[in-house]
Amino acid sequence: MKQVFLLFTVLFFAATSSFASAPASFGEAKVVAKREVFFDQADGPVGDLYCGCKWQWVGKSGGRVDAESCGYEVRKQASRAERTEWEHIVPAWTFGHQRQCWQKGGRKNCVATDPVFRAMEADLYNLYPSVGEVNGDRANFNYGMASSAAPQYGQCSTRIDFSERTAEPRNEVKGLVARTTFYMFDRYNLN
């Protein structure tokens, strides 16, 4: 009986130690997300978060957007429109600006001094590849209805209302965005 218990204990620890720990930084999270989460989704049916564009992986964690695959048209920033960027569905500003580290030096200070902030910034559930231009335009705007904003990116149905500081993601990902937002607010006790 002791041998069975010992064998079970060894197998349990071997199995649990094989699970990777969470990424320690945003930079590490981007690499892990590419390698272990989104590695096979660059030409999948969902595409990037905001426009459904396919992309090609380039470098450690980035990619090149295939604008023709989704009918994307550049609004203003051609260089950002060509690349994928890692979107924080719940922006770093949202989970960081109330923290003491942010008050004393912004995001850079939080990255350097606050392990809870680093965990939130690197949380893989909150990261998704997106067209860089749309990521930049969304900035730290809340999600909501942006029905008064005209389409800005060709056939991409995500809309940004700059005057209302609101971003409305395409219908296909609204559930993903909502679930991720609920997760982040619950997991990290955000207000």
Regions found by a protein language model. Give the residues of each.
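Positively charged n-region of N-terminal signal peptides that target proteins for export
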Residues: 1-4
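Aromatic-lined ligand-binding clefts that engage carbohydrates, nucleic acids, or primary amines
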Residues: 21-83
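Sec/Tat signal peptide C-region and signal peptidase I cleavage site
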Residues: 16-20
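Domain-level detector of nuclease and nuclease-like folds
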Residues: 74-85, 90-191
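Bacterial N-terminal signal peptides
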Residues: 7-15
